[in-house]
Swiss-Prot record:
Signal peptide: none annotated. CDD domains: PAPS_reductase. Its EC number is 1.8.4.8. It comes from Vibrio cholerae serotype O1 (strain ATCC 39315 / El Tor Inaba N16961). GO terms for molecular function: phosphoadenylyl-sulfate reductase (thioredoxin) activity. This is Phosphoadenosine 5'-phosphosulfate reductase. HAMAP family: CysH.
Length: 253
């Protein structure tokens, strides 16, 4: 990258979101010209702090897990376990952890799933507000804790623009919740994902064969039906994001 250094987190955190975006424009323009593999190498070499990859071990999770561990084999892989994942997901986690020798770090809410139900009822049945509270407790807070405890400065994720409208304009590099957020496959299509998995002999999530396009918790994931898009298969179509990939100024339950 011609005579340009990446701004420090300290500098970027003094700016508002618009200023951060502008400050990172030239960096992102450069990153758009690189392959995903080149972006990973660039990110590991140029972005400060400890690095980590978050994974939900969803339908296409093997792509990012393979892409990152091929370059940095011991990178921490953070999973936020709600206690309500599909049995097939837990089996998929075990399979990929063994196969790729993952440095898996599992984080969960301080209160168990059963205790939460006793205390709050089934939050996912309580409309958008209930779903957001559920996600805050089971996904956002555990991920925040992981970033803090592992002292993460750069967070890698496998989000892709094609997945939803809320992700359609995301840049490769941004700042989220005080750390660098880096999305190496943000511009990949489903076709590119398919061929990467095929070329590297990597599996889709087991539920892919049963018609699932996206997999999260058992109670908020639907199998794809004709006429549905991917966004409508999660959270009863009420929302797409679980909150994990959104900026939060504060954390509360």
């Amino acid at each position: 990258m011609p005579n340009r250094t990446v701004p420090t987190l300290e500098e970027l955190l003094t700016l508002n979101k618009v200023q951060q975006t502008l400050r990172l424009t030239e960096v992102n323009q450069h990153l758009e010209s690189l392959t995903a593999q080149e972006r990973v190498v660039w990110g590991l070499e140029n972005l400060q702090g400890n690095h980590a990859l978050s994974s939900s071990f969803g339908i296409q999770a093997a792509v990012m897990l393979h892409l990152l561990t091929s370059v940095k084999s011991d990178i921490p892989v953070v999973l936020t376990d709600t206690g309500y994942l599909f049995p097939e997901t837990y089996q998929f986690i075990d399979e990929l952890t063994e196969r790729l020798n993952l440095n898996l770090k599992v984080y969960s809410a301080p209160v168990s799933a059963a205790w939460q139900e006793a205390r709050y009822g089934k939050l996912w049945e309580q409309g958008v507000e209930g779903i957001e509270r559920y996600n805050q407790i089971n996904k956002v807070e555990p991920m925040r804790r992981a970033l803090d405890e592992l002292n993460i400065g750069t967070w890698f994720s496998g989000l892709r623009r094609e997945q939803s409208q809320s992700r359609a304009s995301l840049p490769i590099l941004s700042v989220q919740n005080g750390v660098f957020k880096f999305l190496p496959v943000i511009d990949w299509t489903n076709k590119e994902v398919h061929y990467y998995l095929k070329d590297n002999d990597l599996p889709y999530h087991p539920l892919w064969e049963q018609g699932y396009l996206s997999v999260g918790d058992t109670h908020t994931t639907q199998k794809w039906q004709p006429g549905m898009n991917e966004e409508q298969t999660r959270f009863f179509g009420l929302k797409r994001e679980c909150g994990l990939h959104e900026d939060h100024n504060d954390t509360h339950q």
